[in-house]
Amino acid sequence: MDNIMSKLISKSEIEKFNKDGAVFLKNKFDIKWIEKLKKGIERDIKNPSPRFKSHTTKPNVPAYLEDYWTWDIVPEFKEFVYQSPYAEIASELMSAKKINLVMDNWFLREAGSKSSTPFHHDISYFDMEGTMCVLWLPLQETGKDEGVSWVKGSHLWDKLFLRVLFKDGHKVEGKECILNGKKYELPPDIISNKEKYEFLKWDCELGDCVIFDMRTLHGTLSSSIPNKTLSRYTLRVAKEDTKI
C-alpha cells in the first residue's frame, strides 16, 4: 500500500478530519466496489472464518453479524484492499508516505435487528501506537439515523477507554487500570448524556463514506430499528509512524 500522489482529498476535508475526528467523503468509491464488497460478504457468510460471530444473543431473531481478518481469504476483499482508492485517500488524510493494513472487517445488521453498536473507540482493541484511521463504507443507502454517529472532537481528549463488547448488553471488558504505562478508563455513558456532546452523522448514498481517527468515539445513537438489512465494510490502516 505505498502512497501514490493524487488529489482525491481537499484541504478542507483534511482539516475536518484532523479537527473533528471524522470526515464525510462524497462519492469516493465507484459502485463496482460496493457490489464487489456485497458479494464478498455473501461469500463470507456461506463459508465464514473462525472469527465469524453474531452479536445478537437471542436465537431466531434478526441478527447483527460480523467477520474480520478475512481480506486474504475472500477475493473481493483482497481486490478492494489492493486496488481501491482507499490507500491513497488515507495517505492524504494522514500525510503518510506509506500505509499499512491493520485490520479489515464487515458488519451486517439484518432488517428488524434490535442489536446495535456500542459507543467505543477502536484504539482500545489494538496494542498499537501511532497515526491510524478507519474507513466506514456503507453498502446500502443509509440515513443518518440508521448508521453510526461520531462524537465530534473526542479523538483529542487524550483518553483511553476500556473495550466494550458488541454482543447484546454491551458489557465493558475489564476494570479501570494502568497497563503498560497507559491509563484505561470506563467509557462515558454517551446515550444517557447526549446533551453533553456534539455528534457527527451523515446521510450516505452509494459510494459515500466516512473516515475517522482510531481514537474517535462512535456508536449507534438512534434507537430506531432498521426496516432493511444494512451492511458496511471497514478497513483500519496505519501511517508509517505506527508501532505495535
Feature names for model-found ranges:
Residues H120-M132, Y197, C204, K228-L230:
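A short beta-loop-beta micro-motif enriched in histidine and acidic residues
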Residues S113, T117-H121, G130, D145-V151, ...:
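A short secondary-structure junction signal
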Residues D127-G143, R236-E240:
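Short, conserved beta-strand element in jelly-roll/cupin
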Residues N47-P59, F161-D168, L206-I211, R215-I244:
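Non-heme Fe(II)/2-oxoglutarate
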Residues D2-D20, K26-F119, Y125-F126:
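Non-heme Fe(II)-dependent double-stranded beta-helix
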Residues N105, H121, L137-E141, W150-K152:
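Short, structured patches in soluble enzyme cores that scaffold and shape functional sites
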Residues K144-L217:
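Double-stranded beta-helix
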Residues Y86, A96, A111-K114, Q140-K144, ...:
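Short, charged/polar surface micro-motifs in flexible loops or helix N-caps
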